[in-house]
Amino acid sequence: MELGLKGKVAMVAASSKGLGFGIAKALAEEGATLSIGSRTKDDIEAAAEQLRKEKNTEVLSSVMDSSNPESILEWTNATIREFGGVDKLVVNAGGPPAGKFEDFSDEDWQAAFELNLFSAVRMIRATLPSMRKRGGGSVLTVTSMAVKEPIDVLILSNVMRSGVTSLIKSLSVQLAADKIRLNNLMPGRIKTCLLYTSPSPRDRG
């Protein structure tokens, strides 16, 4: 399939395994140059090496924490230094812990905000200047089917990912004139390593 991605530079967050890694593989198959980031050095380097061997593509791997603003900027700047700019951004992050409303403190809510909502704001803001300079680009945010039908035990995720969806809807209008396309992916249950650690319907009570 020809999707016009050959030679395009794509940044994919939380991409050492699971859905993020799957997205990176799909982009590589279409000829994109990759900048992948994740928190664990060994995991992200192993993912990069696998992509280079299997997909024969250029890959920059970076240790990156989506909840840390300095880390996001360092990853973006490293990508621009290495490849000259950014064309595609995939905003992805792990989910906050499961639990009921009364289980969570202010600190828990703030941590979920930093990880799942503010990370999207920061990544998009960091890459916008490069996309504008290159005449356009695209952003894909990975949220959850829970933005349509909340999962009762995932209240932190439900709230934050719904916020991301609203952010993308708003920015899709604001950035249309810059030829920057924004879309939101709302996956359901996918057979990745996360599936086996996610709460089942029985666990939700």
Residue ranges and their predicted role:
Residues 104, 150-158, 170:
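Active-site loop-to-helix junction immediately N-terminal to the catalytic Tyr of the SDR YXXXK motif
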Residues 129, 173-177:
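Alpha-helical segment proximal to the catalytic Tyr-Lys
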Residues 14-18:
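Conserved glycine-rich cofactor-binding loop
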Residues 144:
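Residue(s) in the substrate-gating loop at a strand-loop-helix junction
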Residues 100-101, 108-113, 195:
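Substrate-binding pocket helix/loop in short-chain dehydrogenase/reductase
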Residues 196-205:
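Conserved small/polar residues in nucleotide/adenosyl-binding loops
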